[in-house]
Structures are given as structure tokens and as C-alpha cells.
């Protein structure tokens, strides 16, 4: 058997991280077993589905490199096939035409709610209370249509829906890879609508038909769909189709255990891209958010695909931890090759300054060191600010203190020593600093602060010798000179 999984988003909004994790689990399971990973866009809700959301889903999948093995299936294009299957079930006695109107069904619900409210009133005898609540329960029970065993329409050409005839008094058993073995009495499900009164197929019918026609062997989805499984299995049975295996994955919660919301970080996948996270970091973080494999915390996509299994999915909801995501992203930034990291960083730098040839060269020299200094691309870009900004007009308190009297005197002497440096390498520049300290019986703790203040204005930066090498001789001398006139103030 070839394993076939599918990710089936509805294009009514962006691809959020919960959906991205579901897609990832489906992708990894298929790759682990040498199978196929498919994408189905469930766009049957024409009122809410948009082309923009569809494109955002496709873009999010592409960014995460979760590429489907076949072209996407658009559910709306299969409507004729869905109707055909409903008609086949009518012919086989598994489905029927129901002439109950929406108004009648609404009246039934309202009557049931009214009986329930009456049954909760004070002053009733136990017999009256029980009678009212029994009537309420009957009216509010899953709907069994009076036309389920046949019958003529109330009037000629009366509108109708097509409903699946729910099994009478049986148990539906689901053996779920995550939720375990669960059974449900069929009296707890209604005669499910397959075709609406306008002839369009419902979600429940479309999902089952498409899963069968696409050859899906494993349905891996959020546990908010778990109860739907008990309504979908009778459709498989009515059509005489093989039933796929199921794995219903718990939802992602916020760090406080509450339902995930925007304040927790419930953003679209592309929003995380725009915030400076790498796709490999998102994949690594999401795969560990509700799945475990030994003590390994960080995975490449290939590493995860080699070991991913359904048994490792936790039954409890995962909790979104943005600090942990930042740590994972920092790991992947540190391990990204210089050329790719430079390409990713350039747009962030351009948001802050003009990226000319000189700055590009400085960045290329500095990145192997500076890439340790941020958790996201914008943070990394900000840590590079000293490469183009001396911050001379916005010195912090520590920098201003370092540039008083003795500091300015040492800065003037250092400028002369640096101007006379035979070569401009990190080693040579460190030698100049060491020689100056030795000649004046000073420590680097006394010499470094004024020089750092002049070069970076208090902006965070690494060791001075590399900083001077990256800036270049002319820029270093110019930044020092900018502060030397202060001696006369």
C-alpha cells in the first residue's frame, strides 16, 4: 500500500501556524513511508472563500517547502462527482429525499428549547418536570427525518435536501492513532444532509468523496474534526469504500494554556516570515510542538522525515512558546551559509539604511561573527547598525562618560597609532591596541571604552579589532576625529 496523506485547508483566511503544523505532519508522514503528500483546497464555501486566501495558503506552503507531490485539487471543481455519489446512495437506499423545511426544523428546535425551559421552572411535580424534559430531549435529539423510510412529498415539486440514512441503533467505532479507541452510538448522530436544497454538496459529503477519489490512506487533521469522523464513516460505509486511518492532532494553545489567540502569537505563517523567521526554523519548531522523538530538540526537514511517526504525537495540546521559537530560529541563522544569510538580511538592512557597495563589503566580513547576535533577521540587522552609523549624535550615558578628558587624550593617541598601522588586519589592529596598552601601562578596560564610544556611540558591537577591520581605516579614523575637537570644550 502506498501511503497517501492530504492537507485540506479552507481558503477563508490565511494559513495559520495550526494549519501549517497539520500540513507538516501530513508531509512528514508521507515522506517517512515513501508515499505521496497531496493538497486539497476546500473552497466549496463560495461566500467566504477568496482568491487572496488561496494564494496566501499556497505561498505559505511554498515558503515552508511543504510541496505537494501533485497539483492542488480544488474541491469546488468536483461538485458533479459529489452529486453523483449522493444519487448513487439514493438508488441504493442509503440516502433519501427529505422535504422538511428550514422553518420546520427551526420550529422544532425552538419548541424543544421552550419545553426544556418549562421543565426547569420551580413548583413542578416530578412527573411534570420529567415529562417536559423528556419532550425537550426528543425534540432536541439528533434529527431523524420522517422521510427516511420513504414517502411522498407534501406537495408536488416541493424542495428537498438529500440526507444520509443514519444507522438505526448501532455503534460507530474509531481507532484513532492519537485519540485512541472511541465509540459513539448512532442515535447520537442525525440524518446527515448530503445535498442542500439548491443541489450543492455539503462539506461532509465532499470530504469523504474527495478523500476516496484521491486515494487518501491516512487522514491527519486537528482534533476539532474528531466528531466529524463519526458522521463521515457512515458515508464511507454507504458507498462501500475502504476507510482511511485517522490521527486527530490536539490544538495548539497559548503559553498560558488558553485557546490560542493573536496575543499568544496566532498569526499567519507568512507573518512569521515577515517577522524574520526562517522556514526551516518554523518547521523545526512546529514539528516539536506536540510531537517528540527522544531528546532531540532541533530537526531539519529531512531529519524529521526520517523518523516521524504518529505514535510520537502527544494527546495533550502543545503550547506556543515564542521564546523557544526564537532560540530555534537563532540556531538556524547561525548555521545558515553566509551567502544565503546575506541575501535574507539585505531587505532588512534596506529598511534601515541605503545598502551601497561599501556597506555590503562590511556586512560580508562581519556576518560570520554578527550572526550570533540575533534571534530574527530584523534583530540581526539592528545588531549590524554600527557598521553604517557611528551614533555620534546620540551617545548613551556610558559612551559620554568614556569620552571625557582622559578618554579623549587616549583617543587622540590611539588615532595616531592606528593611522601608522602597517596593515589593516584583525591581528595587526589587535597588535596596535596591545602595544598601546603596554607602552602606557594601561589595561584594555581603560583603553577600550573611549575607542568603542567613538566607533559605535554605545551601540552593541563585538571586540574592537574586528570592528575596526570591518569599518576600514578611513571610517575608523573619521569616527575618531569626530570626537577629538571635544577636548577644547
Functional labels for PLM-detected ranges:
Residues 1-128, 228-241, 281:
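N-terminal Rossmann-like or analogous alpha/beta NTP/dinucleotide-binding catalytic cores
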Residues 58, 86-90, 283-286, 305, ...:
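Non-transmembrane alpha-helical segments in soluble domains
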Residues 97, 101-248, 253-260, 268, ...:
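Active-site cores that bind ATP or allylic diphosphates and position pyrophosphate for catalysis
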Residues 227, 239-245, 249-397, 401, ...:
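Catalytic adenosine-cofactor/nucleotide-binding cores of aminoacyl-tRNA synthetases and other
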Residues 399-429:
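Long, amphipathic alpha-helical coiled-coil segments characteristic
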Residues 425-471, 475:
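Helix-rich, typically C-terminal accessory recognition domains appended to large enzymatic cores
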